[in-house]
From Swiss-Prot:
GO terms for molecular function: RNA binding. This is SsrA-binding protein. Signal peptide: none annotated. It is found in: Cytoplasm. Pfam families: SmpB. Keywords: Cytoplasm, RNA-binding. GO terms for cellular component: cytosol. GO terms for biological process: trans-translation. It comes from the Bacteria.
Length: 156
């Protein structure tokens, strides 16, 4: 039976599918502006990074389609689960990432949501989409490596 993947203590959500769908070329850490009910919900582990992306609008960076479930004990002032959330980066970093994403084929994909010194951070990856044959080849390589490791383990 396969071992269950364990998250590191500060990791709240991870986009594992992104590493399968994209070639990650560069990563950068960014803060995220959240409401009170959002951070409470995130700490409970009810955040989902699947299908989310970041983009530059009017000189600011926003993360879109990141789903944070409504906080159960929240009242009528609870947050919208799919609202755009502002990322906290220096102006030079925003300009640099904006230039990279204007190139054809590049996207900003959130890879991980975690806590660092009590602050919620997002690890963004500058990524280029993989073609279907690249995904198949990666799965074949992974299976071959697993078989080799299993054979070596059985041998000794």
């Amino acid at each position: 039976m396969a071992k269950k993947k364990t998250k590191s203590p500060g990791t709240l959500a991870e986009n594992r599918k992104a590493r399968h769908d994209y070639n990650i070329e560069d990563t950068i850490e960014a803060g995220i502006a959240l409401k009170g009910t959002e951070i409470k919900s995130i700490r409970r582990g009810s955040a989902n990074l699947k299908d989310s992306y970041a983009q530059v609008k009017r000189g600011e960076m926003f993360i879109n389609n990141m789903h944070i479930a409504p906080y159960e004990e929240g009242n009528r002032f609870n947050h919208d689960p799919l609202r755009s959330r502002k990322l906290l980066l220096h102006k030079k970093e925003i300009i640099k990432l904006g230039e990279r994403t204007r190139e054809i084929g590049y996207s900003l994909i959130p890879l991980k949501l975690y806590l660092k010194h009590g602050q919620c951070k997002v690890l963004l990856g500058v990524a280029r989409g993989k073609k279907i044959h690249d995904k198949r080849q990666a799965l074949k390589d992974k299976a071959m490596k697993r078989d080799v490791d299993r054979a070596i383990k059985d041998r000794y």
